[in-house]
Amino acid sequence: MKTFAVFGDPIAHSVSPRLHNKAIADLALDALYTRVLLKDGNELINKFRFLKLNGANVTLPHKEFALNLADDASETAQKIGSANTLVLKNEKIYAYNTDAPGFLKAIANFKEAKSAIILGAGGTANALAYALKSQNIDVCILNRSKARLDKFKDHYECFSW
């Protein structure tokens, strides 16, 4: 049986196990998906290995730990600066960020865009900004607090209110 999990803090609210286990059942796969409350992001990889997971999703506040502690990381995850997916391959743990490619797939049928506004400067904003910029789309990020825009201001147009 393959075992998968989602790591986060808090995590009790996550519907990921319900969604993934429904898909697993519908596809008649020999697998299980669960959630893991992880207080200390430094323990992410140790917990992954201890639980003998085949893969995991990672949510707040551990995405940077996922990137920095994995054995290897995709170019996309490295450029974004965080990972939301861990995969075990040949005893090594690989980190990926699926937010950017997933977002691009979701907007693939949209009319050709020249510019986009991202509302909010949270964790996913960096992935979306990276994805849009990779498609030569001008990005503007709007956020209530100016401080959260600091990491974006060198690469994107930013405004706060």
What are these regions (language model features)?
Residues 3, 32, 115, 137-140:
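Residues at the starts of beta-strands that form the adenosine-phosphate
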Residues 8, 97-100, 107-108, 114-133, ...:
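Glycine-rich adenosine-cofactor-binding loop
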Residues 20, 66, 128, 132, ...:
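Hydrophobic packing residues within well-ordered alpha-helices of enzyme cores
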Residues 34-36, 140, 159:
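General small-molecule cofactor/ligand-binding pocket signal
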Residues 135-155:
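NAD(P)-binding Rossmann-fold cofactor-contacting core
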